[in-house]
Amino acid sequence: MVSISDYYLKLKIEQLQLEGDKAFKKEQEKQEKERQKELLKEQEVVLKEIEAAKTKLEKERAHYEQQLEKHPSEELQNKIQEIDKQIADNDWRNAHQSAGYVYIISCDDMKPMLKIGTTRRLDPYQRLTELSNASHAFKFKCHAMIFSEDAFGLEATLHQEFAQYRVNKVNQHKEFFEVPIDKVANVLYTKYSIKDKIDLNPICEDYIASKGM
């Protein structure tokens, strides 16, 4: 009968632990690279959106200035002032790369999970449309869209707040939490004084129609 000494067994266990730690670290590094790649990709999209918006607004401003020279009116002056504000807002978004939206969404084929994520897109709902891809039977429903000057910081704070409800506790970049939306709303209102409207029960028309068939 072959016996394994305690010393050898201890060495083997330590070896397996080291190999496991190495594999875990490698997977974490891979996940972080994927996250950085995704952030860079979105940043490129945002910069293109900002540049396109700037071009459009400047063109509109030039048009209304020409109209104002020909037909002076308070209405045209107000329109130019409104465009100037939009240009200033656009420039501000370009200068503040931490500004964006924290979204809280869910999908009827993933009950009762919530996804808490961040986007810097000028129209954040475009990002939700992209997330509602072919891997989901229904579109994501939006419970909240919260603008923040430090969107990534707010997202990290909320992820930490609801860490015990995280579905995937290994991959920290999987942003799904099995937590009731009313609990999230209560924490946002009472602890963080976030006054944005929280929709506790948004409707997915495709889901409602499918259930009725």
Segments from the language model and where they lie:
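Non-catalytic accessory segments flanking enzymatic or RNA/DNA-binding domains
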Residues: 1-213
